[in-house]
């Protein structure tokens, strides 16, 4: 599509962001450093300072609208989340992970910049995104298909969000940026709707893609074995100056409930998932079979 102009730059450099946003009417600020394995300074530079650069570029060019992609992890305090609304989720006093802390700082700055006259902003946050080209969530589980085991009892429930449902939420976010909108300066979570059992969701992915069922393997005790092991890995990593993939944060995310009430997004943004779970999985499965498996299919 010749209407799309590609620009490669560094989000941490103000001059690059200024050049990329010149001529825009609305910015969807989606770029972020994600995953739990980077250094604190890198998270801060991209997710906080990068957002400040986007705000500055918007003001420089007179861009009045910005939709920020945030994360529900900015509200995680470590406990179960069972059907809570956004209004019931506060920024925690202590963050579980550097990524969440940096995203929260960026989101706060973006919402503070909204004055409802010269600049309008809203934060839209998907939870556990999956779909074609997913190289973070499903990829990291599937690549370890042979050795992965269920953590805990395997009954924990989460919300997931198909990537096109997420994109739909972002588009609706832009439409809600106008004077007097109830969405201004607000944080909304978008999901596929009904929550799922995390390990059932993963097990279906494994079986449909030709890997052994997780439910047929022995389970690993979560809080009494995997969590202490994760803390041990953290300690060793600190001494060695490196990060292991097994962290207390990642173990906790595999054990707790994380599902949300999305009525606020429905009411204020008009959000409804545009793909059903079955439709979403069909598209996801096709990509993983046709593109992902030929490259990564052997697993570990």
Can you say where each PLM-predicted feature lies in the sequence?
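Conserved Rossmann-fold NAD(P)-dependent oxidoreductase catalytic core, especially the SDR/UDP-sugar
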Residues: 49-99
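Alpha-helical substrate-binding/gating segment
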Residues: 113, 142-149, 158-211
């Amino acid at each position: 599509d010749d209407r799309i102009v590609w620009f490669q730059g560094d989000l941490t450099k103000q001059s690059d962001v200024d050049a990329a946003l010149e001529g825009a009417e609305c910015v969807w600020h989606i770029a972020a450093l994600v995953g739990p394995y980077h250094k604190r300074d890198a998270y801060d530079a991209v997710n906080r300072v990068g957002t400040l650069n986007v705000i500055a570029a918007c003001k420089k060019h007179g861009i009045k609208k910005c939709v920020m992609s945030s994360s529900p992890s900015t509200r995680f305090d470590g406990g179960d989340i069972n059907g809570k609304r956004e209004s019931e989720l506060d920024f925690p006093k202590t963050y579980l992970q550097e990524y969440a802390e940096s995203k929260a700082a960026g989101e706060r700055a973006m919402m503070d910049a909204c004055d409802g006259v010269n600049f309008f902003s809203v934060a839209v946050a998907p939870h556990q995104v999956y779909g074609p080209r997913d190289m973070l969530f499903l990829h990291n589980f599937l690549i370890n298909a042979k050795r992965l085991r269920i953590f805990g009892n395997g009954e924990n429930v989460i919300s997931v969000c198909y990537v096109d449902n997420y994109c739909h939420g972002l588009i609706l976010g832009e439409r809600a940026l106008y004077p007097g909108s109830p969405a201004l300066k607000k944080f909304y979570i978008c999901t596929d709707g009904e929550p799922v059992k995390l390990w059932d969701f993963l097990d279906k992915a494994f079986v449909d893609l030709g890997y052994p069922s997780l439910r047929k393997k022995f389970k690993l005790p979560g809080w009494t074995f995997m969590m202490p092991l994760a803390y041990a890995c953290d300690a060793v990593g600190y001494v060695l100056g490196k990060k292991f993939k097994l962290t207390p944060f990642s173990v906790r995310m595999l054990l707790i409930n994380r599902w949300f009430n999305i009525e606020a997004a429905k009411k204020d943004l008009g959000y409804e998932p545009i793909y059903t779970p079955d439709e979403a999985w069909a598209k996801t499965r096709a990509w993983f079979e046709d593109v992902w498996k030929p490259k990564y299919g052997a697993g570990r």
